[in-house]
Amino acid sequence: VYLGGAWGSLFSHAGKGRYRNHRLRVPYPMHVNIGNPMPSNSQTHEVRLAVQELGSAYHEKAGSQKGSLSTAMIRSARQFWRQPFVSDTTDKRLTQGKALISSLLLRDRLKEELNAEDEAVGILLPSCVGGALVNFALALDARIAVNLNFTASSQAFDSAIRQSGIKVTITSRAFLEKIEIQELTDRVIFIEDLGKDFSALDKIKTALKARLYPMPWILPTKCFDRTRTASILFSSGSTAEPKGIKLTHHNLMSNVEAAMEVIPLSSRDGVAAALPFFHSFGLTGTIWL
């Protein structure tokens, strides 16, 4: 028997201290998953494996009802609109609401620069507010984010571009001056240009969208498919040609949910982006957690 949903309930030890940080929900949703009968002489590891398989089936079914990264971001922003969300060492600070508005503005500006063939888009940015917003904007436009490893060798860097098929890269002029990258894609979009000339009317209209519009009015239909690829990560390529891993929305959300079960984070906590966004933990643990 596997009990689904017990972690996070009022009587669980999720959070910092029992009975804290829980919103009382009545009735509280629980799932009881019953497997096939097992012999009374079953070994401990066999029982454990059977329970784990039931748990996997539960999370697979529960995950299919939670939407994609795009829908999760909008739901979270609307629920915690004024909560601090992202900041960096340049003293840029955004709440969840402002981050969503900025991401939607950035997405709409990127639509003018990208075409239908640009399904995968390269990102060459450090761990900063701008880098996070670009990842959010691409997710909100149903595109694939490819965070490129700017510490890799030129051969590994070029291989990642070739394998992912990206034709355009989003970067920063200031950042390019600090790193040793010889060649990029044929088309380069600078984030400094994307953030210019947003009118007050654009900001007001986007704020209303972010706060009030139904999700189907904001997001492309593809954004509701959690089986679509959300990001491509590459190995470092230090010992062989870099290997690319396609991560779906389901993959990333499952990793986030697994992390939340062992890391008792609350709205009062922050996560330091000690690892870059081209790193598996940097992507999952600091952008989407």
Language model features by range: what are they?
Residues 71-96, 229-232, 239:
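AMP-dependent adenylate-forming
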Residues 135, 150-181, 198-203, 207, ...:
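Conserved ATP-dependent adenylate/AMP-binding module captured primarily in the ANL superfamily
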Residues 120-123, 263-289:
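Conserved AMP-binding loop of ANL adenylate-forming enzymes
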Residues 99-105, 212-214, 245-266, 274, ...:
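Conserved structural elements of the adenylate-forming
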Residues 82, 189-234, 240-241, 261-270:
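Conserved pre-ATP/AMP-binding loop-to-beta segment of ANL
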Residues 136-142, 162-163, 279, 288:
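Short hydrophobic alpha-helices that are characteristic scaffold elements of the AMP-binding
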Residues 84-119, 124-136, 153-158, 208-209, ...:
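Conserved AMP-binding/adenylate-forming core of the ANL superfamily
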Residues 1-42:
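A cross-family acyltransferase "interaction/gating" segment
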